[in-house]
A protein has these predicted regions:
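Short glycine-enriched nucleophile-adjacent loop
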Residues: 207-218, 350, 520
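Alpha/beta-hydrolase fold nucleophile elbow
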Residues: 192-205
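Conserved alpha/beta-hydrolase
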Residues: 145, 149-164
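Short beta-strand element of the alpha/beta-hydrolase
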Residues: 81-93
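C-terminal, loop-rich substrate-recognition/catalytic regions characterized by aromatic stacking residues
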Residues: 370, 377-648
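Alpha/beta-hydrolase active-site loop
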Residues: 139-140, 150, 172-192
Length: 648
């Protein structure tokens, strides 16, 4: 009997072992199966490396300027790769590597990123355990890069002149950037560890730098991967609607001073920091990046001249003049932005004007988040697919995908990602909603107006408003979401101090995807004022959710012809010669677009447009005393309205 039990146990054990073996074989085969689709990638190459080696040194430009760089090579069992590899290159004004703790062990980095307590704890433990745990290097800052290195990519990060440990003076001109990147690309390609194929990556200014690089036609640059970049810095960031963006400017100024502090990392051989000290001394009197924001306040028009006679917003900071050259050389571009980014519109404009191989992804995120894996997308997979295709020649089908992927906010997650081969989507319809009279008994705002698809019939109708300079979209807006995420509050408290126009509860869900355009007719007792318009969703409890926004200074209302395809949106030249005060007692129309969005308004909820004359935490509106009065017109002759891009 015991022998029988023992035999059964042995057979059972053998069976379990066989099941486990079959499972492991199946799992391995499944893991090796080729999958290449949006946000998913496996089986097209093998992770051959398990470690990395980081080296930091100087390279020298033809003008003699020494630039600090980090070079990261994959290793296997501590042995660096012994063959040339494709290189991922970042050219940055934001430091290649950060020092996390000072000599006394004090945390000096978390203020820049607003780290949570557990993130700070992790950095502290890492500092105690690892050899270079005090450094926040490129792979630590961008997790997806580490995956690329495992699959046989090298990484090079170079600090721009006048930043970090680099010598020289920072020149923000993109013409200068193009020349510098061209030299660096040639230098990288000449190194024994590079196989001649280089791709660039990076977000924000680093993304814009890639576009300048693509305009050079350098034969070694095979593809770029910019996130949250722009083509027109004036209207996208610094002077949205002609109004000075103090929130971004103040943050940028503070962050650049921070990045010039003791977080800078010397190169490897500069053990005593002498070269770093020399680099900092060399640029002490230069107009470095921390002064750019200060200077920008003094050039309020697109054609304003700097002290040296330069039209900064056109000649220095704009990228639309480079589009023809980018198209001429045909370097492929994969753009990523977010619906809460500062530069959402500009990414659509860039896409519309490029004729090169291109891809555009729009995520439900802000400026700070779009170049990392988040809940919506495996960003690492997309980076891997893109660079494998263009740098390694792996035919993984990425260019067979629809060219535009966009996330429909408010939808169930399984239906959220949408695709299109054209922008705006071909099935989009522009539906005009007119501002209407107040609803009796409601006290949600100054006027409690309605939003109605039927045109007004009254010969005269208006809403009176005394400007309230305390209105704000919050101090955690998209305009400050650069190193930390946006966090809009319930907008009902702001609505209470504003003019609002709201639909009845929706009988069915409504998808708004595209660029809303607003037309505000007004009279005022002052020659100028600012108009801010917010698109919101109001639920059954009266809670109001921010969706998107637009703004315009009344004196900047003149319309002109854009120097590029601007998708038919209202274009304001913002030239000094175009400034037009509001004529006393006469109606004027302000037509402007709101930043694009894709949002599903739920059945039973309401669509709201909120109008204010200030965004206290974000934009610099002159405060007048007494506060001016505004008459927003909404009659048959002056029908204030909003055009919503509805997708059936």
């Amino acid at each position: 009997m015991n022998k029988l039990i023992s035999a059964k146990m042995i057979y059972a054990l053998i069976g379990v072992v066989l099941v486990i073996a079959v499972f492991l074989v199946y799992k391995r085969q499944a893991g090796q199966a080729k999958v290449s689709e949006f946000g998913k990638y496996q089986g097209y190459s093998e992770a051959m490396y398990g470690g990395t080696k980081r080296v930091s040194d100087y390279l020298t430009l033809s003008n003699g300027t020494k630039l600090a760089y980090d070079f990261i090579l994959p290793t296997q069992k501590d042995v660096p790769a012994n063959k040339p590899l494709p290189v991922l290159f970042l050219y940055t004004p934001y430091l290649r590597t950060f020092i996390i703790f000072d000599e006394d062990g004090k945390d000096i980095i978390s203020g820049l990123y607003r780290l949570k307590w557990y993130e700070k704890a992790y950095l502290r433990v890492r500092y105690w355990i690892y050899d270079r745990g005090n450094l926040m290097d490129p792979l630590f800052r961008k997790k997806w890069l580490g995956n690329m290195v495992k699959y046989g990519y090298a990484v090079v990060v170079v600090e721009r002149p006048g930043t970090g440990a680099s010598f020289g003076k920072l020149n923000p001109s993109f013409e200068v950037v193009a020349k510098e990147t061209n030299e660096i690309l040639n230098w990288i390609a000449a190194q024994k560890w590079c196989d001649g194929n280089i791709g660039m990556y990076g977000e924000s200014w680093q993304g814009a730098i890639q576009l300048a690089a693509a305009s050079t036609g350098n034969p070694h640059l095979k593809a770029i991967f910019p996130a949250a970049s722009w083509i027109d810095n004036y209207s996208a960031i610094m002077y949205s609607g002609g109004v000075y963006n103090k929130a971004f400017s103040d943050f940028f100024t503070w962050s650049q001073k921070f990045l010039s502090s003791n977080v800078i990392t010397p190169v490897d051989h500069d053990k005593d920091g002498i070269q770093l000290a020399q680099a900092r001394e060399e640029r002490r009197s230069a107009i470095v990046s921390e002064k750019i924001a200060e200077a920008s306040r003094k050039i309020p028009f697109r054609d304003s001249l700097s002290p040296d006679g330069n039209k900064v917003w056109i000649d220095t900071m704009a990228l639309y003049p480079f589009i023809d050259r980018i198209n001429q050389y045909g370097i492929p571009v994969y753009m990523t932005t977010g619906w809460y980014d500062l530069c959402t519109r500009d990414n659509f404009l860039l896409y519309a004007n490029l004729t090169v191989p291109k891809r555009l992804v729009v995520r439900p995120l802000d400026h700070e988040q779009v170049d990392e894996t988040q809940f919506d997308l495996d960003y690492a997979a997309e980076a891997h697919r893109w660079f494998d295709y263009w740098l390694k020649g792996i035919n993984n089908g990425i260019m067979d995908d629809p060219p535009i992927h966009y996330y429909l906010m408010g939808a169930d997650k399984k239906y959220a990602w949408n695709v299109t081969d054209a922008w705006p989507p071909k099935n989009q319809e522009s539906v005009r909603y007119y501002f209407g009279p107040g609803v009796t008994g409601e006290t949600t705002s100054i006027n409690n107006g309605t939003l109605d698809p039927s045109p007004p019939t009254a010969p005269e109708a208006s809403d009176n408003y005394t400007v309230d300079y305390t209105t704000t979209s919050s101090n955690h807006s998209r305009w400050t979401a650069v190193n930390w995420t946006h966090d809009y509050p319930n907008m009902r408290s702001n609505d209470a101090k504003a003019l609002t126009y709201t639909t009845p509860p929706l009988e069915k869900a409504a998808q708004v995807t595209g660029h809303p355009v607003i037309h505000v007719w007004l009279k005022s007792d002052v020659p100028d004022l600012d108009i801010f318009a917010y698109l919101e969703e109001v639920d059954g409890g009266g809670n109001s959710t921010y969706i998107t926004e637009g703004n315009l200074r009344a004196s900047h209302r003149s319309l002109g012809q854009a120097p590029y395809d601007n998708l038919g949106l209202p274009y304001h030249c913002h030239y000094k010669s175009d400034m037009a005060p509001i004529p006393a007692g006469e109606p004027v129309e302000l037509a402007f677009d709101l930043l694009p969005t894709s949002y599903l308004f739920r059945k039973g909820n309401r669509i709201r447009v909120t109008i204010t004359c200030a965004d206290a935490d974000n934009f610099e509106t002159p405060v007048l005393n007494p506060a001016p009065k505004l008459h927003l017109l909404r009659d048959m002759n002056y029908p204030s309205s909003i055009q919503l891009p509805i997708v059936p």
